[in-house]
Amino acid sequence: MKLTSIPIASTLLSLLAASGTLASPLHKRDDPLNNKQFGLMSIHSGNSYVHLHPFYVGDSGAIYLDPTDGTSTSAVFSMSNGRLVVGNLYASVDSNGTTIFKSDANAASTKFSAGDATNVGYNLLYNGTQSAVACPASDNDQVYQVYFGAGNGNPNCAGIAIEAFVSPSSSSSSSSSAATSTSTRVSSSAKASTSSGAIAYTTKCVVVPVTASATATAKAASAAASSAVYPLFPHGIRLIDSANPSSNSGNVYSPVVFQKQNNHTNTIFTFDVPQVSGSCELNLHLDTSGFPITVEGSNGVGQFILFNLSSVANDSTVYSNRPNRIAEIGRFNCSSSGCDYATNVTCPNSYTAVSYEMMALTDDSYLSFFEEADPLEGLTLRV
């Protein structure tokens, strides 16, 4: 928390003292996350167990980065005077950082706060620092539990940054006043209810509110920009290679697309889809503000094409068994300075998954980049 501007406050106090008038007490600034609804997402590049994972609160009250412990839907949080809240539960942090949500407000930690603003919200701090750690859960080393401290001692624990992305319904770019709506914990039985404005989404689906600049970019990129609200990041990115048709890349963070004569390396993007708003848009935004992008092609410009697919790619998908293409979605060019492309697509059904394939259109066209949330870079699906 910061006090009001010290030079201004000092000047006012001096003037009031000189005039014999009593000064009003100084107040701490209101935390920008106070009484807002927001989702939380972990950031740790290069670690697929923790990078770009939403937060889940299990039946035990512990925080996880994947569905487990009786929950299948990521949590919606709020902040109240330094306390992290899910529904009527409050985060309690013990000496080793174990964090459990409990109904006892008196046991709640009051050390949570918003850090620096980002493109999609704020960094979440505990005790003024980014001290969070994600460790393999004791009963499942494929699922990581979040601690605000030392962790559980597992050698595979990883430090994480935490991004809080605020629901558009509880914040406004033109007003800093806090919303009065209360946070709700979204259960699997209530997935279809979003009237509260809470951000609800399914397994590994990362939902980030659209910023004003991102919206303007999308509109400039496509005259047919839809009214879709949230960009979803892919939870699966898989490379398929015609020269090695049985080779499995696994899940990657850096899509690669190129064509060399008859050899193709294509990328399949898979998205988990929450409740659909009624219109959907596929959007690609790349520039030089994030991780480096690599583009090759005629006169430095690569040409690429997108397809929608008949089924969803999975961990066993390779070039030889890739899903069939339904139709071409569109084509776009990209250079070393980046590219913007947006097009309306047929909406998938709510609470399903959908895959799209990106391919080079011309010989020697090459594109590689890194999907990231801050700054917003890569291919996203808006629903």
Curated annotation (Swiss-Prot):
Pfam family of the protein (one): But2
Compartment(s) where it occurs, according to its Swiss-Prot or TrEMBL record: Cytoplasm; Nucleus
Keyword Membrane in record: no
Keywords: Cytoplasm, Nucleus, Signal
Cellular component, GO annotation: cytoplasm; nucleus
Top-level lineage group: Eukaryota
UniProt key word Cytoplasm: yes
Annotated InterPro entries: Ubiquitin3-bd_protein_But2_C
Record's signal peptide: 1-23
Database matches in PANTHER family: ANCHORED CELL WALL PROTEIN, PUTATIVE (AFU_ORTHOLOGUE AFUA_4G08960)-RELATED
Family affiliation: Belongs to the but2 family.
Annotated protein name in UniProt: Uncharacterized but2-like protein C27D7.09c
Organism (species): Schizosaccharomyces pombe (strain 972 / ATCC 24843)
